[in-house]
Amino acid sequence: MTDRFRITLAQLNPTVGALAANAEKAMAAWQAGRAAGADLVALPEMFLTGYQTQDLVLKPAFLRDAMAAMAALAAQVVDGPALGIGGPYVDETGSYNAWWVLKDGRVIARALKHHLPHDDVFDEMRLFDQGPVSDPLRLGPVALGVPVCEDAWHPDVAGALAAAGAEVLMVPNGSPYRRGKLDLRRQVTGARVAETGLPLLYLNMVGGQDDQLFDGASFVLNPDGSVAVQLPAFEEAVVHVDLERGAADWRAVPADIVAPPGDIEQDYRAMVLGLQDYLRKSGFSRVVLGLSGGIDSALVAVIAADALGAGNVHCVMLPSRYTSQGSLDDAADLARRLGARLDTVEIEGPRAAVEGALAHVLAGTAPDVTEENIQSRLRGVILMAISNKFGAMLLTTGNKSEVAVGYCTIYGDMAGGYNPLKDLYKTRVFETCRWRNATHRPWMQAPAGEIIPVAIIDKPPSAELRENQTDQDSLPPYEVLDAILERLVEGDQSVDQIVAAGFDRATVKRIEHLLYISEWKRFQSAPGPRLTTRAFWLDRRYPMVNRWRDQS
């Protein structure tokens, strides 16, 4: 008779610190697995606490509560399958990132994370102790090896588990999204399968946490490297995977394969889910934003409507004497197509009042960016008042290009609690708007069709803080600016390297200077979803005071 083993993969969305709620989700998955005849129900890395916890796991009281919650969960796991779930483990030897296996009312095994990532968004070397490579776990007919997340990115752990008799690799993860990550995971895990000859189940969590998105997209590889099962990206899923022992090895029975979305859709889904979860997990259900008639605020409004429904999106137009009729018309047109509320609050009176109050202080000076920024800051004051009064989170709308070079006003258009575009360059803003106009998915809560007026996409970008202003008065064309920024930020290239690629040296050096002198602004900027390898927060940590410039 052929040996069989059923694993329920629970690709779910935990909340950091919500121990009881996360345990309840785990038990619901366990009950679903029990009803389906599973032998093991698996949840992702650090699921009980949520992930990433950052310094929360350095707090003894939190670790105490997490350990108590795990013990209480174990007591419930009776008369059914084993439950594998991530959570911290503390003993006299240290504090570990562990994957616990619970069965028959007790803890039957733990796999401790061996390789602690200390790059990009991770600082696990300061949070956890390095665990030894755990022995394979025997569950019924199968010997299960458990490399925890980063462990699968190195050949030694999987190799040691295979040498110790593991027959299947179960990899629980908290692997955050960035562009290209889905393909990279397949390459890395495919290498582990090729090295060991073992099938591999890759289980990732899903959901937003602060600036990070966990995109799910879990999968199962057979010993020949073929994909047997592929779970959806960016949504919860509970899937039952059947393993069968053949003459030579265990193999997964092929089942549903959900094709991953394309690059633009992945980024867009990340922005929508990031906003959705940041609000939900923070206790908000509505947003407010300044709708200028420009492309950035238009895209943020649509992202918000797709995440929350248009009825929970409050748009506010805040015109001054410099606001064009075209911008007024475009903002109204977008709100109408979206079905969102639009209010208009004039700022000309407040602007005149502030400038009048400052007249004796500024006497003898020529108007400059100071007066322009008063307009932006007045808008921030008004929007924050609406946010406070109605309990709606204020969204800020600056794209990565603007945030990179400081083309934004601190305490003005930077005011807000979350920025969906923080890691999206301006050229990609245009691409994303065109894509959204041509695309609709069942998970989008806003209407289908050409929801962003073409006039908004086609007109030259402008802050409209003075007569006849365009962004290109102060910046190179966005195609040039973004190409230079990607080389400086994501590529860490030198000035010489960028010039060798065909860019003007003076322009490159100016952009480099703007990037460095804007660090203090970014330090005070709202969080936003990480889409690239170098988002402006944990990925890229530069000093605010920095006199060095590349002289190459």
From Swiss-Prot:
Domain CN hydrolase: residue ranges = 5-245
Q: Which GO terms describe its cellular component?
A: cytoplasm
Annotated Pfam families: CN_hydrolase, NAD_synthase
Task: Report the top EC class in one word.
Answer: ligase
Annotated region described as Ligase, given as residue ranges? 275-552
Q: Cite a single GO BP annotation.
A: NAD biosynthetic process
CDD domains, A to Z: GAT_Gln-NAD-synth, NAD_synthase
Per UniProt, deamido-NAD(+) binds at N373, E402, K521
**What is the name of the protein in this document?**
Glutamine-dependent NAD(+) synthetase
Protein species of origin: Rhodobacter capsulatus
Lineage, uppermost ranks:
Bacteria, Pseudomonadati, Pseudomonadota, Alphaproteobacteria, Rhodobacterales
